[in-house]
UniProtKB/Swiss-Prot annotation:
Name of the protein in question: 3-dehydroquinate dehydratase
Bilayer-crossing regions: none
Family of this protein: Belongs to the type-I 3-dehydroquinase family.
Oligomer and partners: Homodimer.
Pathway listed: Metabolic intermediate biosynthesis; chorismate biosynthesis; chorismate from D-erythrose 4-phosphate and phosphoenolpyruvate: step 3/7
Recorded GO MF terms: 3-dehydroquinate dehydratase activity
Reaction catalyzed: 3-dehydroquinate = 3-dehydroshikimate + H2O
EC number, UniProt record: 4.2.1.10
Keyword Lyase: yes
Upper taxonomic lineage: Bacteria, Bacillati, Bacillota, Bacilli, Bacillales
Principal EC category: lyase
Catalytic machinery residues: 147 (proton donor/acceptor), 174 (schiff-base intermediate with substrate)
Binding site for 3-dehydroquinate: 50-52, 86, 216, 235, 239
């Protein structure tokens, strides 16, 4: 298999290689539901798991978060785990933690050894440097993300976001938009294709909702390394069941070579 020089290896999978990866979210509200959902999702063999910890009601109880993360690790085995606390401003659930407390929790979860990647939002700006240092210390990969739930900005804005993520030290840059027209979907795909040629890190991009479904199925042809698919419960508008995504990816891979 030919591996792109910008691809990264996380456990046994390559992100940004020649094959698109499927990531399935886990969104349980308590430890029992998180672990049960993870068991169901892992039976479908995604390439990655994302724990959306902003759905976790006890997120302000660090001991319970760490115990749940360790339980997830035991269930996932060698499937890489992405830890995400999505802010309310970018489509996440309201949580009782301020930014400093979120960073402290991220540090604890990185040091636990239970996770492989962590998502941190581009909007945090210079504070990304603190998270970058701790992820490097803990050998955890950093995804720097930006989500536009109210529309789709200009291509130049999306490119600037991905460039900025790389400048802040991201291992992976992620951008998601909410299209209002087919033209918006094309803007996202054009930005992805241009960023793929320019940046030295893997990308994750998607257009959400029904209009954006094509980007979840064919975005990898334009440079998006990971698509998010429903394993049990959706974490964002427009996510498609993992079995359907796998079927379409297989067809596209067969006929696009």
């Amino acid at each position: 298999m030919n591996i792109s020089p910008k691809a990264i290896k996380v456990r046994n999978i390559w992100i940004g290689g020649t094959e698109p990866c499927i990531c399935a979210p886990v969104v349980g509200e308590d430890d029992r539901k998180v672990l049960r959902e993870a068991e169901e999702v892992c039976r479908k063999q995604p390439d990655l798991l994302e724990w959306r910890a902003d759905f976790f009601r006890a997120i302000d109880d660090q001991e319970r978060v760490l115990a749940t993360a360790n339980g997830l690790r035991n269930i996932a085995g060698e499937i890489p785990i992405l830890f995400t606390i999505r802010s309310e401003r970018e489509g996440g659930q309201p949580i009782p933690l301020n930014e400093a407390e979120v960073r402290r929790l991220i540090e604890a979860i990185c040091r636990s050894g239970a996770i492989d990647l962590v998502d941190y939002e581009l909007a945090y700006g210079e504070r990304i440097a603190d998270v970058r240092r701790m992820t490097e210390e803990c050998s955890v990969w950093l995804v720097v993300s930006r989500h536009y739930f109210d529309g789709t900005p200009r291509k130049e804005t999306l490119l600037a976001d991905m460039r900025q993520a790389e400048r802040y030290g991201a291992d992976i840059a992620k951008v998601a938009v909410m299209p209002k027209s087919p033209e918006d979907v094309l803007v996202l795909l054009q930005a992805t294709e241009e960023a793929r040629r320019e940046l030295a890190i893997p990308l994750i991009t998607m257009a959400m909702g029904g209009l954006g479904a094509i980007t979840r199925l064919a975005g990898w042809l334009f440079g998006s390394a990971v698509t998010f698919a429903v394993g049990n419960q959706s974490s964002a508008p427009g996510q498609i069941p993992i079995d359907d995504v796998r079927t379409v990816l297989s067809i596209l891979q067969t006929y696009s070579r």
